[in-house]
Amino acid sequence: LIDNQYIHFRLAELQTEVEALRALTYQACEQHIAGQDATRLASMAKLKAGRLGREVTDACLQFWGGNGYMWDNPVSRAFRDVRLVSIGGGADEIMLGIICKLMGILPSKRRD
């Protein structure tokens, strides 16, 4: 499988996404250390981490085929476990709400 060009390209794409997420995470950490409000960047990083984790483990599972879905395979375990990243500490929808609020695009409540 490793000689397949599609797999090479897919792994390169995933590595690029991981590095972009790492940069976002470092930027959020730098803001926090500097005493600035890092809520927006931290929420973006958490949202992206959950989604990217699912994308990476899904791709690995696809490469492994049926064997990747077997209980004793570490890919199967990672596939199941990574789902908690998007749930624990605030679901994706909560992170999106926080980001929208900080962007100033969340609709305000109307008072009639």
Outline where the language-model segments fall:
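Alpha-helical interface subdomain recognition
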Residues: 1-112
